[in-house]
């Protein structure tokens, strides 16, 4: 959960800008954002994840990342099967779903929000 985004963050920043745990925290925020956009979970769940990560002083956006470069890195992720990206997305706290049918527009919105280009 969060690692598809986290690995892209680490790749795009050449492992120099964020510690692994920081990248995973940002990835968790992005995964729950995408989950909400896909109507898999309630916005309260995403808010709760974000607040928890912020409470520990971890970043929740990756302004040092390019959304387009993240998308390229994600396309090379080991979880890509048959040319389709797979995401571990939240249904609620403690329950996830593996999704490969993610609309490009929703993913683009999540990447824009997660790289601080917009607030989604």
Regions of interest found by a model, annotated:
Residues 1-68:
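Active-site segments that bind and position negatively charged phosphate/pyrophosphate groups
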Residues 40-120:
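C-terminal charged capping/lid subdomain of soluble metabolic enzymes
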């Amino acid at each position: 959960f969060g690692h598809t985004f986290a690995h892209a963050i680490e790749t795009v920043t050449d492992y120099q800008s964020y510690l692994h745990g920081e990248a995973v925290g940002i990835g968790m925020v992005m995964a729950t954002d995408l989950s909400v956009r896909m109507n898999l979970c309630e916005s309260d769940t995403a808010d709760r994840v974000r607040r928890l990560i912020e409470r520990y002083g971890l970043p929740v956006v990756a302004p040092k990342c390019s959304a387009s470069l993240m998308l390229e890195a994600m396309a090379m992720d080991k979880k890509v099967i048959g040319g389709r990206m797979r995401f571990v997305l939240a249904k609620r706290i403690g329950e996830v779903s593996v999704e490969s049918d993610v609309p490009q527009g929703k993913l683009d919105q999540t990447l824009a929000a997660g790289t601080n280009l917009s607030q989604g």
